[in-house]
Amino acid sequence: VSRDIRVGLYGSGRTAGELVAALKKTGYRLTAAVVHSPRRAGQDIGVLTGGDRIGLATVSDLARAVRSGRFDVLLYAGLAGERHQEAMALCAAAGVHMVHACFVHPLIAVDEELRGRLSELAMSSGSRIVGTGMIPGLWLDVLPALLASALPAPVRIRGRRASDISSWGSDVLVHELGVGSRLAGTATRIDLLLRESAHIIADALRLAGDRVESRGGLAMASSDTVVGGVEVRAGEVEGFDQEVVVYENGAERIRLTWSGFAARTARGTAQGSDGGVELQLLGADQSEIAVHVAAPLDPYPGTAARMVSAIGGLPALPPGLHPTTALPVG
């Protein structure tokens, strides 16, 4: 692996810690570390993320860091939202590549105006921006799309993922999932991710998809509990059970379901939140592929591994925003 590739890191949470550890085992050089809070600036990124000192102090000025010329690729390990959009715009303008885990299909996740602006900047500067991860990014999209190529068309795909959300971190649980709140209805963030996964599969199957339905949503606790360190009272959000179904010509072609609860809660125990992934693919001749994946309970090491692996695939991509399927396998 070339030591000429300099890597910048944004974030100080679990994913950032796994990235610091993973990068040590590669030839890539971690040359900058950016944090959201100025209070955390000046600290060693290794120590800040729960590891050993590596001799790299953090900074909090993202714009200045991106424009500094100190790194070629930014590994963004922050939350989705305005900060992520800002980071993409800065990288696209400065000619810095970015790998993130906030979305995997820009056509679904990024509105047309922003997507057009980012694409124009990136194509002008030479920047490549791509998202990857485990879900979305592997279990419910890349893997079934690959398996579908072994069956005669038209193929019908069903996938289900059960997650223990205990290790997801309070920022994600509270700000992205609404755990501990009185929100109700669709699990908006999860629904968007499932729609991205469905779009990746639809691309592989060459489906137009005349109708997409969302079902299920946020789940309320029946009694007081604790989810990943977040206190949840009865009637507040403790997790989700979300589903997306894609139809073509009135027939179901793709059904993706994702449930997430703390394993020690009653609902988590009942639904088997053990990290498992179930895939069922049916070909036109009724031939079937059925797969059970005993996926790791902790998604963070795998997410970091996918992000680091993506660095090597960037040179082969043209400048612009890309879905995770644009990356080479492996």
Model-predicted regions and their roles:
Residues 132, 138-151:
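Alpha-helical support elements that line or immediately flank enzyme active sites
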Residues 36-38, 79, 103-106, 134-135, ...:
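Short, ordered loop/turn segments at secondary-structure junctions
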Residues 1-49:
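N-terminal Rossmann-like dinucleotide-binding module
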Residues 6, 10, 148-268, 275-277, ...:
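Active-site-lining helix/loop region of Rossmann-like oxidoreductase modules
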Residues 266-330:
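C-terminal helical cap and adjacent loop that interface with cofactors, partners, or active-site loops
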Residues 37-69:
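Conserved N-terminal Rossmann-fold NAD(P) cofactor-binding segment
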Residues 64-73, 81-103:
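Rossmann-fold NAD(P) dinucleotide-binding segment
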Residues 103-127:
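Rossmann-fold NAD(P)-binding glycine/threonine-rich loop
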